[in-house]
From Swiss-Prot:
Region (EF-hand-like 1) residue spans: 207-215
InterPro entries in UniProt: Cyt_b245_heavy_chain (IPR000778), EF-hand-dom_pair (IPR011992), EF_Hand_1_Ca_BS (IPR018247), EF_hand_dom (IPR002048), FAD-bd_8 (IPR013112), FAD-bd_FR_type (IPR017927), Fe3_Rdtase_TM_dom (IPR013130), Fe_red_NAD-bd_6 (IPR013121)
Name recorded for this polypeptide: Respiratory burst oxidase homolog protein F
Family the entry assigns: Belongs to the RBOH (TC 5.B.1.3) family.
Primary residence: membrane
Species this protein is from: Arabidopsis thaliana
Lineage: Eukaryota, Viridiplantae, Streptophyta, Embryophyta, Tracheophyta
């Protein structure tokens, strides 16, 4: 290909380009030759590309074949002879109407004038080689056979010709630009780096005698996770070179890579077509479509789609081959790809206007450094004032207690021997006693749940109770180090080394015995209790860290039992011994004799009684909550669903959680799970994913009593009250408060769940849906009452009591998961929301990360089938619901941008449940948008 120079323009005579239409360049063999309708002249088709830099590239010059197309082509419905190309170029031959209009203005005046005379006849045709060849062959066969059969074939071909013509005219500049982002064989992440250097490095790693084998091609080009697709790509590229090879050298690999990495959409489309068209006949049959669907499903880990490949292949053929010729061509594949967005009109992303965004993000304009710093400070104070005042009060109390003990012991005789080491140790001990008492309050769950419902929740951040618990634990560690460090390294040595005079004058009345040795001090009640407490604290604090609690530390057997939730749970019960030792340690003090000076028990009395009372309440309350299992289901992804009867006295809010115990698994362990049923349901349901020892054993116990699913029901195994085997007994305790229960405070909700993290929000969606239905029923009842009151006379009856109007106007639910089977967990809820939410209050977005991002060639056909099936049947092929499934991960910055644009000046509650990494990202994004826009995002993360 070379640029199309000005001198070349004089050789061709083009038709004009009308607004909004794509024209086909046709030329006679000599300049200035007039066009003849009866086909006396020989025509050629010239295909050119107009690049973004206004350069013109000549793509091909092909002879054109005239055919007679009957239809509504001309105003008088008569046949018109039109030049149709026989393409020999592997690329597509289309350009946008706007670019042709620019080009036509640059042509010589006489050429433009001649072209305009024929624009009405020529502007609707632009045929490719495959159609012309197929049409000629089929038409000849039909003419030879004669009769009605040949006429039917001709009619089918002519009908397809008209569809092709319309499809090519519809390929506007905007659709072509969108297409450039599609059918990528190399992901965007790889494009951001020097991909060829990586390929060369891989070539050097896998090459043998200067060649890499077909089996290593996938790893070489970075497609190791979709090896089957890479092998088909290798074969397609080899067929383009008329070869069938098992190995290629470095130069051939570069050639393959250049084709794969080609920026031209037409080139990528041709490669994709060649992958499907294995017999190279220019046609794709239903069997070939089925094979590529199975290949794409395998590459994207969609096992169910693979099983339904035949059904979806028939769907594609039905859409693209209405003439039932038994095959589709390249242009039809392109049409489906370019027009898929017209099918994807369900669960669309939020509406977005740049004007609204510019109004909402006024703060994005540049500010001075001082102004920016002051704005940041004001924002931090506004967003975190609850945390700031609570932490400030806590720190001030600790400082006050430390200074109180510091100066108190400075007046004692022992100070003359041990100095400031004693003062520091005693100050740290006082803060230690205070924090050992305070650390119990954040885990008094019943108390916290009750306080959430009081006005105190406006001033105290109860959502941060677990974080505050951890912060206090950190302060305890510091106090322990200071206290025991000063005693062992400073105070005890000074007592041992004190002169006889100093000991008798300043210390004898404390010990009432001869001067002790270092060992005497350590083996005394104070020393023994202190050392034991430190050992138990080290064990408990270590196993409570994130690395051990979440099994991030891999230990060899049998030490692997020291990691995981069970180790954390049981080791925390060592604090029962710690608190007993702490009280004993406070009784046997060296330097405090009167009972009222020994204040340890005073600090601990109330919190220990409160926490002990809560644990006792759990024991008796769990026994009073008599529940029986109604349904059990085990879904793909190792998720166990338990539906149980709802005790009369068990009242909860959406977003709350409860503790569950199964005596058949462990008579001691209680585990928290979000409630997935709505408060108005007559049952309680929870969803449990197998993540640890306890959940694994729980699933095993219930699997033994479950039965295979009946046809049409989801879930691998099921059980209910009719099951022959008796179901295991369950005990429940709760409900307990969680951040998500405050969703009613916000006008707009953004609910984000990762995997099983969707569970807190399912109850919220159900509750919202129930309220929506009630509001509609209430509106209908008022309407009926108004109509009836018009006909009533002298009635003094009251109008129906006005129910509380739902404050939430919009809810956006984003569910991100790795496995297709996960959508079975809440399929019923999603379908119910899609069916009953006529007002569009709830907008759901499912994201499947195992599928390659939209635009990747490996997921292109999946996207096409997804769009077609939903347009026809109203069901998403991936989730099996009416909610569209997006591929890869959401762009959270775009999500928040569109929300801030659509809901200016709104207060949006962002509720998240999932891994901490994304939680930090969302929290940071919320902070960024809050500083720069009028929309305020309030971030909440679930903690258990």
């Amino acid at each position: 290909m070379k640029p199309f120079s000005k001198n070349d323009r004089r050789r061709w005579s083009f038709d004009s380009v009308s607004a909004g239409k794509t024209a086909v360049g046709s030329a006679s063999t000599s300049p200035g030759t007039e066009y003849s309708i009866n086909g006396d002249q020989e025509f050629v088709e010239v295909t050119i590309d107009l690049q973004d830099d206004d350069t013109i590239v000549l793509r091909s010059v092909e002879p054109a074949t005239a055919i007679n197309v009957i239809g509504d082509i001309s105003d008088d419905n008569t046949g018109i002879m039109t030049p149709v190309s026989i393409s020999r170029s592997p690329t597509m031959k289309r350009t946008s109407s706007n670019r042709f209009r620019q080009f036509s203005q640059e042509l010589k005046a006489e050429a433009v004038a001649k072209a305009k005379q024929l624009s009405q006849e020529l502007k609707r045709f632009s045929w490719s080689r495959s159609f012309s060849g197929n049409l000629t062959t089929t038409s000849t066969a039909a003419n030879q056979s004669g009769g009605a059969g040949g006429g039917l074939v001709n009619s089918a071909l002519e009908a397809r010709a008209l569809r092709k013509q319309r499809a090519q005219l519809d390929r506007t500049r905007s659709s072509a630009q969108r297409a450039l982002r599609g059918l990528r064989f190399i992901s965007n992440k790889q494009k951001n780096v020097d991909g060829w250097n990586d390929v060369q490095s891989n070539f050097e790693k896998f090459e043998k005698n200067g060649y890499i084998y077909r089996s290593d091609f996938a790893q070489c080009i970075g497609m190791k996770d979709s090896k089957e697709f890479a092998l088909e790509l290798f074969d397609a590229l080899s067929r383009r070179r008329r070869l069938k090879v098992e190995k290629i050298n470095h130069d051939e690999l570069y050639e393959y890579w250049s084709q794969i990495n080609d920026e031209s959409f037409d080139s990528r489309l041709q490669i994709f077509f060649d992958i499907v068209d294995k017999n190279e006949d220019g046609r794709i049959t239903e069997e070939e479509v089925k094979e590529i669907i199975m290949l794409s499903a395998s590459a994207n880990k969609l096992s169910r789609l693979k099983e339904q490949a035949e059904e979806y292949a028939a769907l594609i053929m039905e859409e693209l081959d209405p003439e039932r010729l038994g095959y589709i061509e390249l242009w039809q594949l392109e049409t489906l790809l370019l027009q898929k967005d017209t099918y994807l009109n369900y669960s669309q992303a939020l509406s977005y206007t740049s004007q609204a965004l510019s109004q909402n993000l006024q703060g994005l304009r540049g500010k001075s450094r001082i102004h920016r710093m002051s704005s940041d400070f004001v924002y931090i104070m506004q967003e975190n004032w609850k945390r700031i005042w609570v932490l400030s009060l806590w720190i001030m109390i600790m400082i006050g207690l430390f200074l109180w003990k510091f100066f108190q012991y400075k007046q004692k005789d022992a100070f003359h021997v041990m100095g400031y080491c004693l003062l520091t140790a005693k100050g740290a001990a006082e803060t230690l006693k205070f924090n050992m008492a305070l650390i119990l309050f954040p885990v008094c769950r019943n108390t916290i749940t009750w306080l959430r419902s009081t006005r105190l929740s406006y001033f105290v951040p109860f959502d941060d109770n677990i974080n505050f618990h951890k912060t206090i634990a950190g302060a305890i560690v510091v106090a322990v180090i200071l206290h025991i460090g000063d005693h062992l390294a400073c105070d005890f040595p000074r007592i041992v080394r004190a002169t006889e005079y100093d000991y008798n004058r300043y210390l004898f009345h404390y010990f009432q015995t001869k001067q002790p040795t270092y060992f005497d001090l350590v083996k005394g009640p104070e020393g023994i209790t202190g050392i034991l407490m430190v050992i138990l604290m080290i064990i408990s604090f270590t196993l409570a860290t994130r690395w051990f609690r979440r099994n991030l530390v891999k230990l060899p057997k049998p030490f692997d039992r020291l990691t995981g939730f069970n180790a954390f749970w049981y080791s925390h019960h060592l604090f029962v011994i710690v608190y007993i030792l702490l009280i004993l340690h406070g009784i046997f003090l060296y330097f405090a004799k009167p009972w009222y000076v020994r204040t340890t028990w005073m600090y601990l009395a109330v919190p220990v009684l409160l926490y002990g009372g809560e644990r006792t309440l759990r024991y008796f309350r769990s026994g009073s909550y008599s529940v029986r299992l109604l349904k059990v289901a085990i879904y793909p992804g190792n998720v166990l669903t338990l539906q149980m009867s709802k005790p009369t006295q068990f009242r909860y809010k959406s977003g709350q959680y409860m503790f569950v115990q199964c005596p058949a698994v462990s008579p001691f362990e209680w585990h928290p799970f979000s409630i997935t049923s709505a408060p108005e349901d007559d049952y309680i349901s929870i969803h449990i994913r197998q993540l640890g020892d306890w959940t694994q054993e729980l699933k095993r116990v219930f699997s033994e009593v479950c039965e295979p699913p009946v046809g049409g029901k989801s879930g691998l195994l099921r059980a209910d009250e009719t099951t022959k085997k008796s179901l295991p007994k369950l005990l429940i305790d709760g409900p307990y408060g969680a951040p998500a229960q405050d969703y009613r405070k916000y006008d707009v909700l953004l609910l984000v769940g990762l995997g099983i993290g969707a569970t807190p929000f399912i109850s919220i969606l159900k509750d919202l849906l129930n309220n929506i239905v009630k509001m509609e029923e209430h509106a209908d009842s008022i309407s009926d009452f108004s109509r009836s009151s018009e006909y009533s006379t002298g009635s003094n009856g009251d109008t129906p009591r006005r129910k509380r109007i739902l404050k939430t106007t919009n809810a956006y639910f984003y569910w991100v998961t790795r496995e297709q089977g996960s959508f079975d967990w809440f399929k019923g809820v999603m379908n119910e929301v899609a069916e009953l939410d006529q007002r569009g209050v709830i907008e759901m977005h499912n994201y499947l990360t195992s599928v390659y991002e939209e635009g990747d060639a490996r997921s292109a056909l999946i996207t096409m089938v997804q769009a077609l099936n939903h347009a026809k049947n109203g069901v998403d092929i991936v989730s099996g619901t009416r909610v569209r499934t997006h591929f890869a991960r959401p762009n959270w910055k775009k999500v928040l941008t569109k929300l801030s644009s659509k809901h200016c000046n709104a207060r949006i509650g962002v509720f998240y449940c999932g891994v901490p990494v994304l939680g930090k990202e969302l929290s940071k994004l919320c902070n960024t948008f809050n500083q720069k826009g009028s929309t305020k995002f309030e971030f909440h993360k679930e903690h258990f």
